[in-house]
């Protein structure tokens, strides 16, 4: 089973989401990720991967792998802020202490 940790930035983004249905879809997706099923996801380079959520405006979760089974959820966003969110995730990852 995978362990998902959250940055403060990710936690704040998720907490501020007003779309209750989308929030439920995201929580369901994160639950599946703990079981190893990341679904529609791809590596973006620089150690950052993107999990695409097919709900609302196309939500995205940016994460990195830490060790065998630990994943750190870096940043969340949607399609309209994708380029900025990817850069934020990469910058945040660089600023975090190594494993």
What does each of the following model-derived ranges do?
Residues 1-31:
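Solvent-exposed, charged helical/coil patches
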Residues 27-55:
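A short, surface-exposed loop/turn module that caps and links secondary-structure elements
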Residues 18-21, 46, 70-71:
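Amphipathic alpha-helical interaction segments
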């Amino acid at each position: 089973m995978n362990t998902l940790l959250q940055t403060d930035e990710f936690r704040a983004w998720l907490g501020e989401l007003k779309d209750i249905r989308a929030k439920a879809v995201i929580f369901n997706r994160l639950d599946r990720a703990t079981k190893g099923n990341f679904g529609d996801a791809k590596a973006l380079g620089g150690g950052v991967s993107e999990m695409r959520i097919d709900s609302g405006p196309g939500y995205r979760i940016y994460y990195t792998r830490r060790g065998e089974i630990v994943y750190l959820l870096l940043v969340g966003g949607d399609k309209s802020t994708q380029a900025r969110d990817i850069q934020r995730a990469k910058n945040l990852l660089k600023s975090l202490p190594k494993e």
